[in-house]
Amino acid sequence: MLSTMDTVAALAAVFVAGTLLSRLASWIRYHFKIRKIPLAHNLGLLDRIFTRKATEEFAVDFKNLSRKGLAKDKNAFRVQTDFGEMVILGGHYAEEMKGDNGLSTGDYTKMELMGDIPGFEPFSFAGDHRELMHTVITKRLNRALPRLAIEQSVEVADFLSHNWTDSNEWHSIPLYQMLMGLVARASVSAFLGPELARNERWIELNAQYTVVGIGAVHALRPWPRFLLPLVHHFHPKAKAVRAILSECRQIMEPILRRRAQAKQGIQIKSAVSDTALDWFEEVAASIGQSYDPTVAQLTFAVAAMHSTTDHLCQILIDLRDKTEVVAAARSELVDVVTREGWNQTALSQLKLMESIMKESQRMKPINRVINKRIVTEDLHLSNDVFLPKGSFVAVSGERMHNPSIYEDPEQYDAYRFIKKAEEGPESARFSGYTSITTDSVGFGYGKHSCPGRSYVSQEMKVILSHILLKYDFRFPEGYQPKGVNNGFDSITDIMASCMIRRRAEEVKLPG
């Protein structure tokens, strides 16, 4: 007769065996359905089953892997990522994949970034509260841009004076770290006003959350998904993410309490103003949706802070030996501000600056794919491409480097989009920094393209205007950028040092 322990062991063995057989059957079914789409990796059978070699190749060299995949099939190829196999469609599928029919962005993001784990909510907030986020950005944030042009200029000026200094002697700064602090200050001032914009700890936590959070996601990925609800309680990196969120709540709670008291009439003097706290509160009430105010604010940091910093850093690196371009950009800026003053209209007329920004984004987008989704029902696409339910899919951004679309696509040309605008009214319409086409997908494409790109554009112009007018900059002799490829992400040289010195600006900006 079997003992109780023997019975438990036998049941456990049956459960494990059943789980393994079920997973094997699912693996076989999936690969049978998707067999027509080639694998970009050149792997033997064992390396296809045990995916470590493939995921390492994906992590360090997706750009080359993408070239190999598209050479095998221009329509679609498969790649082994560190969170599962994914189908990458050619860039010409952007139009076909711009909607949500049979596709889910929110579910994909939650799975990729583990947004269902406690403490990781800022990674899934936008997907779980899509209407709330979209309305806040398009109806409230974008309408505040005229006011923010002045307010952010003041914050940028203050940050530069204290951190880049007013010394006219050449001195070195860690470029990425300095720009991160600058972007964080400008962003927090836009969303939460001067009180938190001058709170250094809040700024630090906003900058840290994405870095620590993404690090935790990568650390948890090797674990089987069914164990994550248990593992995250003990994993030190997951606990570090929760600690940051907890400290953010501690900073935010007294502010929220004062706002509530002011609205109830307990406190006559109210600090309530036109900030993102108001926007979320009012929009959420109008659509009948509950939300976490602290998570909502950190979501902005996750969505834009690091990508904007990366882009600004890359722009300055791209301009390192372009003294004539820098001089022309300064001249344009002086002419526009002298004529228009400092306002949203003036910023919209900085065409060379826009071309510079768009060209750096084209050359090095922070993400080499767009429209990442989970397929929620079997999909039949054009050219006989079949995507089975449950598969991961994305669209390649390769058209931004296609020589049939862009002349000398691997060469940086600061004037590229100015020249493109001169080709005719239609070209001019789609040559602006925030314009989106299937050939220019730096902000995504379709229903889930970045709704805050007008804000990003203005914030970057404010920052670049102050830097160009107030500072000379150069990089060490012989400097070669050392960017990092990390899967789909293309990251700028975060270790770059830049030499700067104060210059006498030709026109004064607010601040």
UniProtKB/Swiss-Prot annotation:
GO biological process terms, semicolon-separated: secondary metabolic process
Molecular function GO terms recorded: heme binding; iron ion binding; monooxygenase activity; oxidoreductase activity, acting on paired donors, with incorporation or reduction of molecular oxygen
Domain of life per record: Eukaryota
Its EC number(s): 1.-.-.-
TM annotation in the entry: 7-29
Any single Gene Ontology cellular-component annotation: membrane
SUPFAM superfamilies: Cytochrome P450
Pathway the protein contributes to: Mycotoxin biosynthesis
Annotated residues for binding of heme: C450
Residues carrying sugar: N64, N163, N343
Keyword Oxidoreductase tagged: yes
Subcellular location(s) per record: Membrane
Membrane topology annotation: Single-pass membrane protein
Swiss-Prot/TrEMBL keywords: Glycoprotein, Heme, Iron, Membrane, Metal-binding, Monooxygenase, Oxidoreductase, Transmembrane, Transmembrane helix
A Pfam short name: p450
Enzyme type, top EC level: oxidoreductase
Keyword set includes Mitochondrion: no
Cofactor(s) in the UniProt record: heme
UniProt main location, coarse: membrane
Similarity-based family: Belongs to the cytochrome P450 family.
Role according to the record: Cytochrome P450 monooxygenase; part of the 2 gene clusters that mediate the biosynthesis of fusicoccins, diterpene glucosides that display phytohormone-like activity and function as potent activators of plasma membrane H(+)-ATPases in plants by modifying 14-3-3 proteins and cause the plant disease constriction canker.
Protein name (Swiss-Prot/TrEMBL): Fusicocca-1,10(14)-diene-8beta,16-diol C-9 hydroxylase
